Amino acid sequence: MQAHFISGVADIRNPIKQTQTVSADHRRGLSMTFNDSIREMFAMIELELRRLRHDRTEIYTRAIQPILWLGVFGTIMARVNAIPTGGIPYIDYITPGVLLQSTIFVSVFYGLTIVWERETGILKRLLVAPASRYATVIGRSIASGVRAVVQALIIFPVAVLLGVKFIPNPIYILTAFLVLFLISGGFAALSIFVASIMKTRERFMGLGQALIMPLFFASNALYPIKMMPPALQHVAVLNPLTYAVDAVRGLMISGDVSHLAVDMTAIVVFDVVVFAVASFSFRKIIE
């Protein structure tokens, strides 16, 4: 009788032990997946930084266009005084927009690297790694954001030499570069999504060119939104670049940060949405 009782207790405890074992294995598996994802993310960042260190020509050549925007367009339009800028010199007014245009140019064409890696088979080998596609997309987007910030750091001293007066507040300047980093990472994720749709480099280049300039002109980068036609004003309100320009202009030029919370919220929402969409579509890149 006592033996049967002990056996029954053992039978009851056995499932509990098995459940605890399965639960521990599950937690261990999740921990390994998370660690793999973090390693993959940092591996992507390290890969891009190595590329940047070994080939800086691309960064310097892409800095030429924004420098021309400031040096030629900015100085000429400053003499015309045709655009109301709220008392801010015109070259100062457009500097945040030019910085963002140059960084977004880097980010939007980041997907071209993805297309090339797919064509050469490199991407397929990278995707064999156990890390999640979310880690891959976020890692690559962070790396692209770093490249974009390096691009902006080249243009920044040139703007100072051209007479642009920045707010002498290191916290504001660092926050402005954080905005550049966040919006650039978001556009890099958008570029990865586009790369999953466009199967050739030629198609990707065409769509990239068609994306950058309309976004640039349909924002407050060169002129206030109130100067736009009503239909274009609605587009500008939905344009994430508008909020990034407003944030950087307030932090670097005017010192007005009253809209910073709204601007940052809009940028973060944009980043979250495009990260999710890009991660979902990333596996289709190798199909």
Regions found by a protein language model. Name each.
Residues R51, A82-G86, F216-V273:
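Membrane-interfacial helix-loop-helix junctions in multi-pass membrane proteins
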Residues F73-A82, A159-I171, M198-T200, Y223-M228, ...:
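Short helix-capping/hinge motifs at transmembrane helix termini and TM-loop junctions
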Residues R133, V137-G208, M213, G255-S279:
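Alpha-helical transmembrane segments and their short interhelical loops
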Residues G29-Q65:
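Aromatic- and glycine-rich beta-strand/loop motifs that create alpha-glucan
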Residues F280-E287:
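Short cytosolic juxtamembrane segments of multi-pass membrane proteins
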